[in-house]
Amino acid sequence: MDELIRRIAAESMIKHIEQENCYHLIVASGRQEIQLYENNICYHYCLRAGEIEIRRLSDDIVVSYLKAPDIVGLSTYDKSQVYHYIKTISNVELLAIKHENFYRMIEEKKLWQEAFTLSIYMLNINYIRDEALASRNVYGIVRHYIEIFWSMEEERSRFSIFEFILSRTNISRSSLNKILKDLCLGGYIKMERGKLIDKKNLPLNY
């Protein structure tokens, strides 16, 4: 699904929520944790500015990286369905909407198409991730995340390739270090102080 379509859908939903004034604004700095379920209330969040990670509650693994504009919590219905939390990466602005207000607004404003578009986009991301993690080959998983990281032109200048991969997998640091070192020696990638600065076509097998 085209990124532009996702962005338009998110902007449309955020615009209607702002007009309805059915939210409270959260302004947070980086490295803050925000829950989807708090004080017996389910929340949906509109990311109006900044960057966040969606992390699993069970093991703190990053399952998604989001940049504004975006919507968080479309699949959340009650506390039994909350498996993730938000961790901010940068300074952010989030519009927090109670579950009942969120779906009432979707119904009244006929925003089901936008909600569907964003849900499908997130499902596709999850399918791609799960397909990569289904591989029993550690190198195959590392290769997958190197390719993803390389496509994130702005982010790769700020983040370490080590932390990017380690936060998204259960691969040991020693195993990852060996693979990255061998790829550097083979001339497939180039790193400086943990930053990925160049990448050639990676071998399919290792």
Which residues does each PLM region occupy?
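Cyclic nucleotide-binding regulatory module and flanking cytosolic helices
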Residues: 1-33, 71-72
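Short beta-strand segments in beta-sandwich/barrel cores
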Residues: 25, 34, 50-56, 93
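His/acidic/aromatic-lined binding-pocket segments of jelly-roll/cupin-type domains
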Residues: 25-26, 35-37, 41-47, 63-64, ...
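Glycine- and acidic-residue-biased ligand/ion/polar-headgroup-sensing regions
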Residues: 41-58, 68-70
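Residue-level signal for tight coil/turn positions that link beta-strands
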Residues: 49, 90, 192-193
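Cyclic-nucleotide recognition modules
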Residues: 63-119
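Polybasic "coupling" helices that flank or enter modular domains
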Residues: 113-171
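Phosphate-/nucleic-acid-contacting segments
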Residues: 147-206
